[in-house]
Amino acid sequence: MSALSSENVNGVYIPSALLVFGTFLVKKEFVPYAVALTAVLAGFKLFTGDSKARKVLNPTEFQEFVLKEKTDISHNVSIYRFALPRPTDILGLPIGQHISLAATIEGQPKEVVRSYTPISSDNEAGYFDLLVKAYPQGNISKHLTTLKVGDVMKVRGPKGAMVYTPNMCRHIGMIAGGTGITPMLQVIKAIIRNRPRNGGTDITKVDLIFANVNPEDILLKEELDKLAAEDEDFNIYYVLNNPPQGWTGGVGFVTPEMIKERLPAPASDVKVLLCGPPPMISAMKKATESLGFTKARPVSKLEDQVFCF
């Protein structure tokens, strides 16, 4: 936060000046003591004000955030790191929710808005990261590819019906396709971060089916494999349309048989999370229903057994 910000002017400098001036009017010889006192209090206020984590998201208004870094993962996938106003700021995004990005796109009659889930969390202050795959028809994803470091992006949030809380169910099954892994990773990391061995209370089991076309399309594989290796209650099953020779994972589309074998069976304390391309999600809704899960609604609610991001 700037030393000349309105918060400091109204909360530090003006009260300090009034204290010194008031002391001068009442008893001039006490002015040096008043100056010393205000210096100490102002210094404390400035220091603690800068060190306190502040949630910056606004659910009703778009704000502009500066692109700090761009890391290319492949020819059409990048991680965009946006800076928050000050190093101690956090987004203030509940686990399971997402943000809206907006931009004016040439040829579009009005501002285009799309939803994305950061792959960073509020444990990482001062910035947030977005993993984005650029699609030929993707207005916002293509717009992001044109941004240079120092450019800004309009962001609003949080939004979404899912708010994950520790132990909200005994066992979670996940089915993700492509960039649909981002909300899953957010939940997975929150669960593992809050395990008893890490000082938390979350004992939720998590099984993930992650489907992609080619091996090189598997996003965040290194991080996912590391999490699975460190946590015995988190398991991943990869599925590829075009597997390499010697592939031991699933092949083709995700089937009811794969779901039955790899994910928990229907129960009152079980939840299935879905995120991926629309055709895949449509197929997964039918598959989970055929296995005895409650039929997924067109628009998911937190209490649903099958929840679609």
UniProtKB/Swiss-Prot annotation:
Gene behind the chain: cbr1
Compartments where found: Mitochondrion outer membrane
GO cellular component, one term: mitochondrial outer membrane
Summary of the function given for this chain in its UniProt record: NADH-dependent reductase for dph3 and cytochrome b5. Required for the first step of diphthamide biosynthesis, a post-translational modification of histidine which occurs in elongation factor 2. Dph1 and dph2 transfer a 3-amino-3-carboxypropyl (ACP) group from S-adenosyl-L-methionine (SAM) to a histidine residue, the reaction is assisted by a reduction system comprising dph3 and a NADH-dependent reductase, predominantly cbr1. By reducing dph3, also involved in the formation of the tRNA wobble base modification mcm5s 2U (5-methoxycarbonylmethyl-2-thiouridine), mediated by the elongator complex.
GO biological process: protein histidyl modification to diphthamide; tRNA wobble base 5-methoxycarbonylmethyl-2-thiouridinylation
Domain of life: Eukaryota
Required cofactor(s): FAD
Catalytic reaction annotation: 2 Fe(III)-[cytochrome b5] + NADH = 2 Fe(II)-[cytochrome b5] + NAD(+) + H(+); 2 Fe(3+)-[Dph3] + NADH = 2 Fe(2+)-[Dph3] + NAD(+) + H(+)
Binding site for FAD: 145-160, 171-208
Quaternary structure (record): Monomer. Component of the 2-(3-amino-3-carboxypropyl)histidine synthase complex composed of dph1, dph2, dph3 and a NADH-dependent reductase, predominantly cbr1.
Broad enzyme group: oxidoreductase
Transmembrane segments: 29-49
Biochemical pathway: Protein modification; peptidyl-diphthamide biosynthesis
Main location group: mitochondrion
InterPro entries noted in UniProt: CBR-like, Cbr1-like_FAD-bd_dom, FAD-bd_FR_type, Flavoprot_Pyr_Nucl_cyt_Rdtase, FNR_nucleotide-bd, OxRdtase_FAD/NAD-bd, Riboflavin_synthase-like_b-brl
FAD-binding FR-type domain segment(s): 60-165
Keyword Membrane set for record: yes
Lineage: Eukaryota, Fungi, Dikarya, Ascomycota, Pezizomycotina
Membrane association type: Single-pass membrane protein
GO molecular function: cytochrome-b5 reductase activity, acting on NAD(P)H; NADH dehydrogenase activity; transferase activity
Similarity field: Belongs to the flavoprotein pyridine nucleotide cytochrome reductase family.
E.C. number(s) listed in UniProt: 1.6.2.2
Keywords, ordered alphabetically: FAD, Flavoprotein, Membrane, Mitochondrion, Mitochondrion outer membrane, NAD, Oxidoreductase, Transferase, Transmembrane, Transmembrane helix
The name this protein goes by in its record: NADH-cytochrome b5 reductase 1
